[in-house]
From Swiss-Prot:
Lineage: Bacteria, Pseudomonadati, Pseudomonadota, Gammaproteobacteria, Enterobacterales
PANTHER family per UniProt: PHOSPHATIDYLSERINE DECARBOXYLASE, PHOSPHATIDYLSERINE DECARBOXYLASE PROENZYME, MITOCHONDRIAL
HAMAP family in alphabetical order: PS_decarb_PSD_B_type1
Keyword match Lipid metabolism: yes
Quaternary structure and interacting proteins, as annotated: Heterodimer of a large membrane-associated beta subunit and a small pyruvoyl-containing alpha subunit.
Protein name per UniProt: Phosphatidylserine decarboxylase proenzyme
Organism: Salmonella arizonae (strain ATCC BAA-731 / CDC346-86 / RSK2980)
Site keyed Cleavage (non-hydrolytic): positions: G253, S254
Length: 322
């Protein structure tokens, strides 16, 4: 009954207006009120402020400033092995595995279309059929900047307007083609591991999606697909990003989907649904390495794993299924 009510709200509530209201409020400087909201948020979601460059909540002028807070340089060590791709975001893996022709796993028993995710771009989809995907959910407590898993040359960016459904276990199980329906920004890179797509997916109250090379992509929400391209290689107009470098951010955030070409990478064996991710830790290895490195994600303290799972609707909504 409770789940049915929650699901009904996804279709009834004015998600766009709620998102605009959240974005407006999060960008306002409200002095003591801003600090109070941040303090309550930190307490409720158990945000670890000791990892941030500015642990004093009074130092943030707006809630958005707090939400995209930078971390200290020493808290996310980067695995520098050239054969290793690293996690692009702090969060929880919601799904990962092989792309079966045009099908990507959304939730148990539910798939969505690769081509639909890529806004009907069948040429781009052909690069990833039978490849590998990873879907990472960023909970409210997480660091909301997104980084590069490997070195990459930006070739294409597509803004796809769409719905603003919440992204959690309940909607993944009940909203068909959830990620292919929600607003998103698709970024295609040339890498040493073949083509890679990194997709930033919006959701309810995601006020803004930004990239480091173009700034704010959305809003405004004009309801049309937009496409930009960049040259390859050493061209002076090309955009080159290094492994571990920031590539984008959410202001009130959501989900990152990575797509890799077939036969190019192997995911770290210990990773699974609901694995906690930290930027810079091993995500995958190259299939073309001369010596396969033996790598595992750095073990996290049990209390940190519990806090991450407790903050994630991917876990919380399962409690309501009975």
């Amino acid at each position: 009954m409770l789940n049915s009510f929650k699901l009904s709200l996804q279709y009834i509530l004015p998600k766009l207006w709620l998102t605009r209201l959240a974005g407006w409020g999060a960008s306002k400087r409200a002095g003591w009120l801003t600090k109070l909201v941040i303090d309550l948020f930190v307490k409720y979601y158990k945000v670890d402020m000791t990892e941030t460059q500015k642990p004093d909540t009074a130092s943030y002028r707006t809630f958005n400033d707090f939400f995209v807070r930078p971390l200290r340089d020493d808290v996310r060590p980067l695995n520098t092995d050239p054969n290793i791709l690293v996690m692009p975001a702090d969060g929880v893996i919601s799904q990962l595995g092989r792309i079966e022709e045009d099908k990507i796993l959304q939730a148990k028993g539910h798939n969505y279309s690769l081509e639909a995710l890529l806004a009907g771009n069948y040429l781009m989809a052909d690069k990833f059929r039978n490849g590998t995907f990873v879907t990472t959910y960023l909970s409210p407590r997480d660091y909301h900047r997104v980084h590069m898993p490997c070195n990459g040359i930006l070739r294409e960016m597509i803004y796809v307007p769409g719905e603003l459904f919440s992204v959690n276990h309940l909607t993944a199980q009940n909203v068909p083609n959830l990620f292919a329906r929600n607003e998103r920004v698709i970024c295609l890179f040339d890498t040493e591991f073949g083509p890679m797509a990194q997709i930033l997916v919006g959701a309810t109250i995601v006020g803004s999606i930004e990239t480091v090379w173009a700034g704010t992509i959305t809003p405004p929400r004009e309801g049309i697909i937009k496409r930009w391209t960049w040259p390859a290689g050493e061209n002076e107009d090309s955009v080159a990003l290094l492994k571990g470098q920031e590539m984008g951010r959410f202001k009130l955030g959501s989900t990152v989907i990575n797509l890799f070409a077939p036969g190019k990478v192997d995911l770290i064996e210990s990773l699974a649904n609901l694995s906690v991710t930290k930027i810079g830790q091993p995500l995958a290895t190259s299939t073309e390495a001369f010596v396969a490195p033996e790598v595992e994600p750095v073990p996290l303290p049990e209390e940190e794993i519990k806090a991450e799972h407790d903050a994630s609707p991917l876990v919380d909504d399962k409690k309501d299924e009975t």
